[in-house]
Amino acid sequence: MGLVDLHTGLGPWGHGELISHEGANDAGYRRGTDWWGDVRSMVDGESVSAALSGDWLGALDELLPHVEITAVALEFGTVDVVSVLQALRADAVLHAHGDARGPDAPAVRAQVRAAFADDDPAWFDAVSAR
């Protein structure tokens, strides 16, 4: 089974990076490179993503033990990483200490949207081409 999990926020603007949760010596990583070409490993430090544990792609092998799974995330870059982190922080603060329907909420939602979905038609074209 092949699975592509779409993400936005990290990496160069409009570039789509295929990211494996497995290392270069793992069968799933090798199948991914056979199927899709240039796959980067978060485990080996090759990708725009930090190495994560507990991600759902990694859990698939346990959930479906009799299925050969080849899973990657496809991460499209939007804005610089500091802007992404600031948007995530603003959203977390709003939900932990603010009012999701209060006067600050629309600005925070706009900040999060700007960090994860560029409205520029050229960005959409780059994402669609990938």
Whereabouts are the PLM-identified features?
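C-terminal accessory segments enriched in acidic
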Residues: M1-R130
